[in-house]
Amino acid sequence: MSEHNPRVAMFGGTFNPIHIAHLRAAVELREALSLDVVHMVPAHLPPHRSAPGVGSDDRLSMLRLALADTPGLVADDREIRRDGPSWSLDTLKSLREQYGDQTRLLMAVSYTHLTLPTIYSV
């Protein structure tokens, strides 16, 4: 019997606030790529922009409420629990430790390309 290797994506952002475009993009990503789970990861301390106006715990609570009835989308608090800046590379490494060597995908919201030069270890 073969072992199932889950297909996983990370969707990071400040989610300040979470809105329908975030949700629609995550659902479309999951469906189009036949993913098992999309980890929606609110940035605690985004290093490439100013701090969000809403606190991390409140943004996480809003995200959890928004995802409550959406299978395959998970509110992931790993960046909020981590001290220091919220580097996507660190989050991907953490997901790799959790899942092993299965598929990894990174989805970034559409405006990330504008700040790409400021993103750690590109």
What are these regions (language model features)?
Residues 113-122:
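Single conserved hydrophobic/aromatic residue that forms the stacking wall/gate
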Residues 1-114:
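Nucleotidyltransferase catalytic core that binds NTPs
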